[in-house]
Amino acid sequence: VMNARNSLIVAGLAVSEAAFTMVSPQVVCERKVADGQAVKAGTPLLVISGPTQAILTAERVALNFIQRLSGVATLTGRYVETVLGTGAKILDTRKTTPGLRRLEKYAVTCGGGTNHRIGLYDMVLIKDNHLAALAGEKPNPIAAAVQRARAKYPALKVEVEADTLDQARQAAEAGADYVLLDNMKPEQLREAVQLIAG
């Protein structure tokens, strides 16, 4: 029996089961909970039966998946709970563990979060290095970058990374679909959100 050691939000049951059944199709896993479910310490997650050697061979890999993905889901759930009632959404990052992107992004959704981008192909993200290349453009580099992105990729959403309140304002005025507020203190974040919301 695989039990939760702490209170957590479950994620990764299917991939954990796959670790067992890839070692031996004779291993049978019975789910006792569902991904996305909040459980208390001691709650049974999976009941595993089959050849002992196969179970012990796959056990560590299966546990690693459950631990990692449930950790992501649980932390996401805490953030989601913190912003409950504010209208804010918790979005994940594209900066994931190599080879685990889809699984970690799935775990974010188990915790109540929203996937931001899967890769570089599904949204235009205008960052500081792009803006530096457009220094001197009129009316400002952000407006120029948003305009160029919309012309070249009309079907994609455009996001602008803003390090300052002025950049956040310019991004909103330029019609960016999203403004990513980077490295701002909580009081700056509040002001930027009010500024962007109009």
Per-segment meaning from a language model:
Residues 183:
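Short secondary-structure boundary segments
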Residues 1-159, 163-174, 178, 190-195:
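Acidic/glycine-rich phosphate/pyrophosphate-binding loops and surrounding catalytic core
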